[in-house]
Amino acid sequence: MPHRYPAAKINKMPKGSVPALQQEMLRRVSKRYDDVEVIIKSTSNDGLSVTRTADKDSAKTFVQETLKDTWESADEWFVR
């Protein structure tokens, strides 16, 4: 389940936060999907890709909501 996060936001993130975000997303998404891979890439545009699932719309909505919750709760899980 590849995931891309906006380059502008990634470039402004503290050192070490991209791997931490990837691990936290993996932890959260794995609760719903057994065989999951989370990939965070720095790109020039916003995008979210969800692949290898029967119900892509449902999976994409779940991942978007999970990403939003994860991003908003960074103070709780990101240790610098």
UniProtKB/Swiss-Prot annotation:
Asked if the keyword Membrane belongs to this entry, the reply reads: no
Q: Which UniProt keywords apply?
A: DNA damage, DNA repair
Q: Which GO terms describe its biological process?
A: DNA repair; SOS response
Which domain of life, per UniProt? Bacteria
Keyword DNA repair tagged: yes
Protein name, as recorded: DinI-like protein Z2083/ECs2153
- Lineage of the native species? Bacteria, Pseudomonadati, Pseudomonadota, Gammaproteobacteria, Enterobacterales
